[in-house]
């Protein structure tokens, strides 16, 4: 493990993070010690720790060392897809799409059998297209990824379940709640029956299912699902995580739906603080998720008759939406602007 220690210390990685990288190699019985692979592994560790900028830096170092020695082609794709995913996490969507497309082009031009790397890139583009409101493009890419995974693994596989999950999220945004719920339930069934130890996947799917259930007016079931997801997440995470923030926000929407505004306000504020804790680790102080919480807090104050507090939060939200939203038709963004104009 000396080569890992020396390599990472040489680029300024702190001792505690080097230890985590070494632990990852040991847990996975990984004996590939070329520079590209080491930096890719370090990037994964920083990503898991919520440090997106440091993760991006490690992926860039991995890519920069591609032609300095021996490397596996999979490490090339991993580093480029990794850079793309970090740019995506940091909100630099155009750069992310270029990176994802470069992976797709190489794989297709060379007729390579790197289906997992191809699917990862397709999913990345689909996700960004969804964020931008390009729903037809998102649906096309998700279905392409689903077709590849079904051919590779069959329907009842974790990789297929992941794509079904994303399709559920897309159909939710398209207000096709029946399809959304069907996809979430199918995904959840696969996870629970085939992969019961995949707690994050289970909890994540439950939280998204709750969102669609509330849209159908099933507030009691939605509240139950959101709380179930938080209970599972709390078994996994010891630090603030955006998945927990999402479920807290979801509980806020249930109480808002019920006109229980004091409870809604409490949950939206909890969600806001959790999101802030998450994104500040990557020095990201403005984010769409934070803006959405600010908007919801402003909305609840307005519904409660507190116009002064409402205006303060709505103005903060609007400013952040303007600097972070890539979809001008986003529902929260448009609603926030309308309240301020009225």
Curated annotation (Swiss-Prot):
PANTHER family: NEPHROCYSTIN-3, TETRATRICOPEPTIDE REPEAT PROTEIN (AFU_ORTHOLOGUE AFUA_6G03870)
InterPro entries xref list: Apc5_dom, TPR-like_helical_dom_sf, TPR_rpt
Pfam families from the UniProt entry: ANAPC5, TPR_12
TPR-type repeats, residues: 36-69, 77-110, 119-152, 161-194, 203-236, 245-278, 291-324
Keywords: Repeat, TPR repeat
Name listed for the protein in its UniProt record: Putative TPR repeat-containing protein R856
Domain of life (superkingdom): Viruses
